[in-house]
């Protein structure tokens, strides 16, 4: 019995060490010497900043992919691959409308490549240039507003330059990173004095536009002193003292989950409150911070839609049946959630967005005001309450 067991063990060892070890990382295929057939009938569809190449695939069961090689605008060699299950590939990121030579190869599972097929593409006007040609600006409070169109919805950066203190160099001041189809970007924080500015566009492929240079004087803009703010009670206003909340917490320079204004609960919408800014001002913009916290941002009582009214004279007691007699509607505000994720879900971009405060610019033609009245019309969750983390206002004090 012992002899039989020893024989079995010996045979097992011999079989184990006689097995050839297979390297699963090596290329594999039907014939290691075969060269794949190239693509045929290549058709070119030029697009902004690139092209889509359509082709007929060879009838080769060992085909792995199609590879395109070309030299990008910045001189670097680029490679784009498409699987054997699709009959096209896309080239993007070219920065002009020059002709570009593209070389196509097929690749099999043994990583053998076919003979080359060369085609020429002529990209349409690239996104970086299309955005640049659409740029416009208008002088505004504390700076200017840059408008742009981005019809291809490409990822671009719009850079803002200003002349430095020596007057000899242009320096970086601000940038907008976007893939929105169009937009207006306010450039803020600039002094009320003449200076030279520049705007240019760049994309993720290092393509850069020319620079628009202009000389302007931004309008004066003051950050309003929150120590002058006071709350008021006008007919039709709701209480803002629920769960240790207080209306003055909305302008105490503290943004926390334990320091916020909270309406009584539950109270049917709309929810109104009135405040005195302490000065008469031509408002330019304001910033609204939601109550922070994972369980409340873009939910609970975070306002989704609301209106802002103003007036210069101190309001009388008013009437609940006519709550806005003597008030001017300054703007309607619609809170934005960048990710558009469902209720209770949010992205890091959402958190970053609201942590900076959601900013709203007042129309240029609004009257001078001292008193403001907010009317909350809907919360993000539908709950019958409203909360405010913090408010800040800018404008030209009269």
Model-derived segments and spans:
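Aromatic, loop-rich ligand-recognition surfaces of beta-strand-rich domains
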Residues: 254-324, 356-398
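Preference for solvent-exposed, low-hydrophobicity sequence contexts
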Residues: 162-185, 196, 200-241
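Recognizes extended acidic, P/S/T-rich segments that occur
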Residues: 57, 61-97, 115, 161-192, ...
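Pro/Thr/Ser/Gly-rich low-complexity, intrinsically disordered linker/stalk tracts
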Residues: 20-61, 96, 113-153, 210-233, ...
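Disordered, acidic Ser/Thr/Pro-rich linker "stalks" and the adjacent N-terminal cap
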Residues: 213-278, 291-294, 298, 344-352
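Beta-strand-rich modules
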Residues: 64, 89-117, 183-218
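C-terminal motif of bacterial Sec signal peptides marking the signal peptidase cleavage site
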Residues: 15-18
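Surface-exposed loops/turns
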Residues: 47, 96-97, 191-192, 279, ...
């Amino acid at each position: 019995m012992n002899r039989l067991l020893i024989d079995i063990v010996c045979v097992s060892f011999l079989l184990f060490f006689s097995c050839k070890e297979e390297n699963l990382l090596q290329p594999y295929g039907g014939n290691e010497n075969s060269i794949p057939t190239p693509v045929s009938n290549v058709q070119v569809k030029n697009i902004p900043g690139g092209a889509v190449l359509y082709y007929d695939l060879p009838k080769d069961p060992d085909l792995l992919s199609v590879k395109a090689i070309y030299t990008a605008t910045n001189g670097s060699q680029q490679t784009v691959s498409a699987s054997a299950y699709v009959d096209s590939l896309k080239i993007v990121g070219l920065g002009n409308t020059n002709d570009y030579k593209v070389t196509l190869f097929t690749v099999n599972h043994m990583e053998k490549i076919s003979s080359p097929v060369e085609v020429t593409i002529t990209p349409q006007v690239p996104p970086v240039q299309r955005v640049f040609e659409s740029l416009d600006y208008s002088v505004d409070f504390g700076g200017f507003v840059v408008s742009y169109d981005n019809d291809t919805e490409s990822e671009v950066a719009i850079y803002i330059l200003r002349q430095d203190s020596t007057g000899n160099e242009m320096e970086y001041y601000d940038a907008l990173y976007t893939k929105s189809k169009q937009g207006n970007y306010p450039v803020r924080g600039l002094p009320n004095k003449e200076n030279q500015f520049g705007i240019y566009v760049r994309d993720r492929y290092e393509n850069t536009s020319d620079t628009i240079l202009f000389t302007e004087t931004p309008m004066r803009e003051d950050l309003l002193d929150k120590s002058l703010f006071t709350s008021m009670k006008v007919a039709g206003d709701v209480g803002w003292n629920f769960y240790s909340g207080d209306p003055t917490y909305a302008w105490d320079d503290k943004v926390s989950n334990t320091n916020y204004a909270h309406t009584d609960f539950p109270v049917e919408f709309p929810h109104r409150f009135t405040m005195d800014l302490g000065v008469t001002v031509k408002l330019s913009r304001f910033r609204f911070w939601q109550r922070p916290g994972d369980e409340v941002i873009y939910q609970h009582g975070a306002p989704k839609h609301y209106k802002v009214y103003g007036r210069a004279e101190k309001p009388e007691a008013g009437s609940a049946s006519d709550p806005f007699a003597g008030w001017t509607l300054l703007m309607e505000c619609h809170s934005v959630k960048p990710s558009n994720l469902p209720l209770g879900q949010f992205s890091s971009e959402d958190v970053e967005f609201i942590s900076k405060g959601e900013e709203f610019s007042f129309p240029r033609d609004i009257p001078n005001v001292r008193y403001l009245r907010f009317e909350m019309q809907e919360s993000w969750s539908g709950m019958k309450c409203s909360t405010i983390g913090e408010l800040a206002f800018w404008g030209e004090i009269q």
